[in-house]
Swiss-Prot record:
One of the primary rRNA binding proteins, it binds directly to 16S rRNA where it nucleates assembly of the head domain of the 30S subunit. Is located at the subunit interface close to the decoding center, probably blocks exit of the E-site tRNA. This is Small ribosomal subunit protein uS7. HAMAP family: Ribosomal_uS7_B. Belongs to the universal ribosomal protein uS7 family. Keywords: Ribonucleoprotein, Ribosomal protein, RNA-binding, rRNA-binding, tRNA-binding. Pfam families: Ribosomal_S7 (PF00177). Part of the 30S ribosomal subunit. Contacts proteins S9 and S11. GO terms for cellular component: small ribosomal subunit. One of its GO terms (molecular function) is tRNA binding. GO terms for biological process: translation. It comes from the Bacteria.
Amino acid sequence: MPRKGHVSKRDVLADPVYNSKLVTKLINHLMKDGKRAQASSILYDAFDIIKDKTGREPMDVFEEAMNNVKPVLEVKARRIGGSNYQVPVEVRPERQTTLALRWLVSYSRLRNEHTMDERLANELIDASNNTGSAVKKREDVHRMAEANRAFAHYRF
């Protein structure tokens, strides 16, 4: 166990364009090797593509996508009597947001479009329409939790 005590969580500054902490978190997840300017330009270009394709406000599409990707339940491995059980647990709101952002970015990177801003825009549009790989990942996580419902009494 660490001896230096508890590290407090840093507060994220709101994004200057959309005035949203969620957008800043998405930029942080997109960022590679500390290149924040590159990550933010990818995100803003993706938001422009969303506005052109859907005609809707990009923040509305993004928030809807987030709500469709956030998991409610997940499974955690717990060792009981020499065997490991996948125990379904509820996901805390902060972790829901983190997982949703992580899945959106990772499945955007796996898409086949030409540039990253196109990939991200299309993944966000798909997620807002309840399709796409990130939503499928959430469904898989929920299916695992449902399949292991019998072990719910081993809660943490």
